[in-house]
Amino acid sequence: MIGRLRGAVAEIGEEEALIDVMGVGYVVRCGSRTLQRLPALGEEALLHIESQWSESAGLRLYGFGTREDRRAFVLLQAIQGVGPKAAMAVLDVLSPAELASAVAREDKAAVGRASGVGPKLALRIVTELKDKPITDGPVLMTAPGAVAAAPAKAAPTGDAVAALMGLGVAEVNARRVVEAAAAKLGDEATVQALIKAGLQELGR
């Protein structure tokens, strides 16, 4: 089974990426957090892989930016009712450290923010992940409401993403290039500057 891939980012889609390893393209399913953190097209990426086989779908590769992400994905799927889609959804809203914190606080509401995860399944996840090694670091008892709270984005960032989407750029790609541009240009960046930088990153 494949455990890790290092290669050039050939394509980035809504739910997957194509990684070119010495001329062989691997389709890797990734959550939105992982996709947003991939480097630009043509640049080298390293993904930790969980390989799964089923008679209906064949071999599927699930990619993660860190070993902890992959471990959390495996631990989540060991719970009855949690498949790959639900596990990815949980990790889209909670990092492994945030998930460990939610489990320690028995905060099923935080877990229940994941798409497709109802109250009963969220409770089962919180209950069954207790004492599981979700993260290598210390578990922080973060106050409710602070778990997975996304930093406030300046309005120009959202406007730039919307503008790129209006030009036909997929949302995940638009967010990735705009966030990268915002990090380089700083908080004072204008919408126009972010759009221009984003288009340059996309090669348009």
UniProtKB/Swiss-Prot annotation:
<dbReference type="InterPro" id="IPR013849">
    <property type="entry name" value="DNA_helicase_Holl-junc_RuvA_I"/>
</dbReference>
<dbReference type="GO" id="GO:0009379">
    <property type="term" value="C:Holliday junction helicase complex"/>
</dbReference>
<dbReference type="GO" id="GO:0048476">
    <property type="term" value="C:Holliday junction resolvase complex"/>
</dbReference>
<feature type="region of interest" description="Domain I">
    <location>
        <begin position="1"/>
        <end position="65"/>
    </location>
</feature>
<dbReference type="GO" id="GO:0000400">
    <property type="term" value="F:four-way junction DNA binding"/>
</dbReference>
<dbReference type="Pfam" id="PF07499">
    <property type="entry name" value="RuvA_C"/>
</dbReference>
<dbReference type="InterPro" id="IPR036267">
    <property type="entry name" value="RuvA_C_sf"/>
</dbReference>
<comment type="function">
    <text>The RuvA-RuvB-RuvC complex processes Holliday junction (HJ) DNA during genetic recombination and DNA repair, while the RuvA-RuvB complex plays an important role in the rescue of blocked DNA replication forks via replication fork reversal (RFR). RuvA specifically binds to HJ cruciform DNA, conferring on it an open structure. The RuvB hexamer acts as an ATP-dependent pump, pulling dsDNA into and through the RuvAB complex. HJ branch migration allows RuvC to scan DNA until it finds its consensus sequence, where it cleaves and resolves the cruciform DNA.</text>
</comment>
<dbReference type="GO" id="GO:0006310">
    <property type="term" value="P:DNA recombination"/>
</dbReference>
<dbReference type="InterPro" id="IPR000085">
    <property type="entry name" value="RuvA"/>
</dbReference>
<dbReference type="GO" id="GO:0005524">
    <property type="term" value="F:ATP binding"/>
</dbReference>
<keyword id="KW-0238">DNA-binding</keyword>
<feature type="region of interest" description="Flexible linker">
    <location>
        <begin position="143"/>
        <end position="152"/>
    </location>
</feature>
<keyword id="KW-0963">Cytoplasm</keyword>
<keyword id="KW-0234">DNA repair</keyword>
<comment type="similarity">
    <text>Belongs to the RuvA family.</text>
</comment>
<feature type="region of interest" description="Domain III">
    <location>
        <begin position="152"/>
        <end position="204"/>
    </location>
</feature>
<dbReference type="GO" id="GO:0009378">
    <property type="term" value="F:four-way junction helicase activity"/>
</dbReference>
<keyword id="KW-0227">DNA damage</keyword>
<keyword id="KW-0233">DNA recombination</keyword>
<dbReference type="InterPro" id="IPR010994">
    <property type="entry name" value="RuvA_2-like"/>
</dbReference>
<dbReference type="GO" id="GO:0005737">
    <property type="term" value="C:cytoplasm"/>
</dbReference>
<dbReference type="Pfam" id="PF01330">
    <property type="entry name" value="RuvA_N"/>
</dbReference>
<protein>
    <recommendedName>
        <fullName>Holliday junction branch migration complex subunit RuvA</fullName>
    </recommendedName>
</protein>
<comment type="subunit">
    <text>Homotetramer. Forms an RuvA(8)-RuvB(12)-Holliday junction (HJ) complex. HJ DNA is sandwiched between 2 RuvA tetramers; dsDNA enters through RuvA and exits via RuvB. An RuvB hexamer assembles on each DNA strand where it exits the tetramer. Each RuvB hexamer is contacted by two RuvA subunits (via domain III) on 2 adjacent RuvB subunits; this complex drives branch migration. In the full resolvosome a probable DNA-RuvA(4)-RuvB(12)-RuvC(2) complex forms which resolves the HJ.</text>
</comment>
<dbReference type="Pfam" id="PF14520">
    <property type="entry name" value="HHH_5"/>
</dbReference>
<feature type="region of interest" description="Domain II">
    <location>
        <begin position="66"/>
        <end position="142"/>
    </location>
</feature>
<dbReference type="GO" id="GO:0006281">
    <property type="term" value="P:DNA repair"/>
</dbReference>
<dbReference type="InterPro" id="IPR012340">
    <property type="entry name" value="NA-bd_OB-fold"/>
</dbReference>
<dbReference type="InterPro" id="IPR011114">
    <property type="entry name" value="RuvA_C"/>
</dbReference>
